[in-house]
A protein has these predicted regions:
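Small-residue-enriched flexible segments
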Residues: 2-62, 67-69, 75, 80-157, ...
Length: 430
């Protein structure tokens, strides 16, 4: 008997993009998995499953993917542990779960996507002074339905998860920028734990796999990630240029013809601050480090032009300051203050701007610093609620990190205190 011809409407429905999410807690990993899989019953086969688990489940991490893969179907699996997790429950409302055992799962059907999962040993990386090809070879060819040579005119996106105990993460980030210029790279450093294995998940078989180093997925073809990076600070004072610096120590700043030590420059700024702001300077002062040495920006330039870094020391003899970043002469810098109100204002502005540029994403991923959450916002679900103001009904998943991987000024950095958003959108949208 001849086979039945394909039913066009059924084929179209099967290949339509979709996103399903689940968020559940439980004393045991079995309880959490059972709740998640009940919520995702009938979801169908996904192209990519993202799994984020609280560090409370660290000792059971080797069993997590096998338990999920017995009940859920996906071509690729990726995830990690976190100090907390972000997810969207059966009520359709996203939540941030800190310091409690919780499991978040996001299933994605991405027709036309080229997906290339990868695992990288960060202790054995190519030479940054060598050619780019060894760095590109760290990400193997994909096996997706749309497998082709990647379009050189359309950079891919890279989702990157790092293990907190693995060396060489900063070098890897630089190497990926070297190998894939123009590609958006987003993710975070997983949560720490005392179990004797890694914090990362990568598994395309029923066995699953716990990894250290770095795992991730290259996303190309019909889909891409768009980044929104909220560093949680607001600038105080003018933009300065670095006149003298040694490694990570800033010795002298200039503004026009005037030259001062960093401490003298800060003292001149303090005069114009309120008593509350001067008190904040005592414990919440940072330095924004510009990502271009060309053309001094105006004082009201967007904050995303600067990478916010910790001030780690002051030399009272000469007024120099040490920064948690290598500084070069000619670089632009600006002092910054961090507080909950500033963080919310900045995040709201950036998310609303993103909403005005793109249609509703299929899903959002949040990689948030452990220093955010309730401690920063003084309320539950601080970051995800801001996102829902800009993107109503958006499914969100993610994790609280020990460092966030995200671009600023076209360069990928390892951040702290940051909310790094990855929005999954179809290619061809503005």
């Amino acid at each position: 008997m001849a086979g039945l011809p394909p039913i066009p409407w059924l084929a179209r429905r099967d290949r339509a993009p979709w996103c399903r999410t689940a968020l559940a807690g439980g004393v045991s990993i079995e309880d959490a998995v059972a709740s998640v899989t009940r919520a995702l019953l009938g979801a169908g086969t996904a192209d990519l499953a993202l799994v984020f688990a609280s560090a409370s489940y660290a000792s059971d991490l080797p069993r997590l993917l096998p338990l999920l893969q017995r009940r859920l179907r996906s071509r690729h699996w990726l995830g990690c542990l976190g100090g907390g997790v972000v997810g969207t429950g059966s009520d359709g409302i996203p939540h941030e779960r800190e310091q409690e055992p919780t499991l978040s799962v996001l299933l994605l059907r991405l027709p036309g996507a080229e997906l290339r999962p990868f695992a990288i040993d960060t202790a054995d990386l190519p030479d940054l002074d060598g050619p780019a090809e060894p760095w590109r070879a760290l990400i193997p060819p994909g096996d997706g339905e749309a497998r082709t040579e990647l379009d050189p005119t359309t950079p891919p996106s890279l989702l990157v998860l790092g293990d907190p105990a693995s060396p060489g993460l900063a070098d890897l980030i630089s190497g990926l920028d070297y190998a894939w210029p123009g590609a958006v790279k987003l993710g975070g450093v997983a949560g720490q734990h005392a179990a004797g294995h890694g914090s990362l998940l990568l598994g395309d078989t029923e066995q699953g796999s716990v990894r250290s180093g770095v795992v991730g997925c290259l996303i190309a073809g019909a889909w891409r990630l768009e980044a929104v990076v909220a560093q949680g600070c607001r600038p105080i004072g003018p933009v300065f240029e670095v006149e003298q610096a040694q490694r990570n120590v800033v010795l002298q700043l200039s503004r026009g013809a005037q030259r001062n030590s960093p401490v003298s420059a800060l003292q001149s700024i303090l005069v114009g601050l309120s008593p509350e702001e001067r008190e904040q300077v005592r414990h919440s002062l940072f330095l924004g480090v510009g990502q271009s040495s060309f053309d001094l920006p105006s004082d009201d330039d967007p904050l995303e032009a600067f990478v916010v870094r910790n001030l780690i020391g002051v030399d009272p003899r000469n007024g120099a300051v040490a920064v948690a970043e290598r500084i070069r002469v000619g670089q632009k810098v600006q002092f910054q203050l961090r507080d909950g109100a500033s963080s919310r204002q900045e995040a709201r502005q950036l998310l609303n701007r993103q909403a005005g540029r793109t249609p509703q994403p299929l899903a959002g991923l949040l990689f948030a610093c452990l220093g955010r959450g309730q401690g920063l916002h003084q309320r539950d679900d601080g970051d995800v609620s801001l996102c829902r103001e800009a993107f109503a009904d958006l499914p969100i998943a993610g994790v609280f990190c020990n460092g966030e991987i995200a671009p600023i000024g076209g360069i990928t950095h390892l951040h702290g205190y940051t909310a790094a958003w990855a929005f999954l959108v179809p290619c061809g949208t503005p």
